[in-house]
Regions:
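Extracellular beta-strand-rich, repetitive "passenger/adhesive" scaffolds
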Residues: 1-89, 95-174
C-alpha cells in the first residue's frame, strides 16, 4: 500500500488466503488474466477508500468478492467492450465511462449493490428481459448512455434508495 499514490497492473489476482491492500488513490487495471478476468479475487481486498479503474477495451470479467468480506470502495469502468460482474458490493460509487456495456455475467444469481451512486456517463449498464438479478443503488445519475433496468420478464428488480436522475441518457425497461 502506497497511501495516496496510484498503482497500475495488467490484471489483479488475489489468491485464496492472499490480501491486496489497495492504495487510497487509484488502482488501474489495463488487461486481464488468461482466464478472462481483469480482477479475480479469491482472497481479501482491502480498499483503503481508494478507487479501482478498469481501463481495458476488450471484453472481460470482474470477480471482486473475495473471502475478506470487503469489496471495492469506488469503481470506474472505462471500457468500449463488455465488462461482466459476479455478485458484488461497491461501498461507495460506480462510474461507467466508454461505449461498452457493464452487466452481470449471467441471467441469475449476480446481485449488485452500489451503496453510493451509479453514475452512467457513456455506454450501457444492465442486462436483458430475462434477468433475475437484484440491483440496489443509493442513487442513480444518468448523464449519457443507456441504463437497462432489471425486471420485466425475469424476476429481477432495480432498487434505488435515494434519488434517480436522468439528465441526458436513455432509460430502457424490460
Amino acid at each position: 500500500n502506497a497511501a495516496g499514490k496510484n498503482a497500475t497492473f495488467g490484471s489483479l489476482t488475489i489468491a485464496s488466503g492472499g490480501t491486496y491492500s489497495a492504495t487510497s488513490g487509484t488502482t488501474t487495471i489495463t488487461n486481464e488474466t488468461s482466464g478472462g478476468f481483469a480482477i479475480n479475487n479469491d482472497g481479501t481486498f482491502t480498499h483503503n477508500k481508494g478507487t479501482v479503474k478498469i481501463d481495458y477495451d476488450t471484453s472481460t470479467n470482474l470477480d471482486i468478492t473475495g473471502t475478506g468480506g470487503v469489496d471495492l470502495y469506488n469503481l470506474i469502468v472505462d471500457s468500449d467492450a463488455t465488462v461482466g460482474y459476479n455478485t458484488s458490493v461497491i461501498e461507495n460509487n460506480l462510474t461507467k465511462l466508454g461505449s461498452g456495456l457493464i452487466r452481470p455475467t449471467g441471467d441469475s444469481g449476480r446481485n449488485l449493490t452500489v451503496k453510493g451512486t451509479l453514475l452512467l456517463q457513456a455506454g450501457s449498464f444492465g442486462r436483458g428481459p430475462n434477468d433475475t438479478h437484484t440491483n440496489t443503488f443509493g442513487n442513480i445519475v444518468v448523464e449519457g448512455g443507456e441504463l437497462i433496468l432489471t425486471g420485466g420478464g425475469g424476476s429481477g428488480k432495480t432498487i434505488v434508495n435515494g434519488s434517480f436522475r436522468n439528465v441526458g441518457g436513455t432509460i430502457t425497461s424490460h
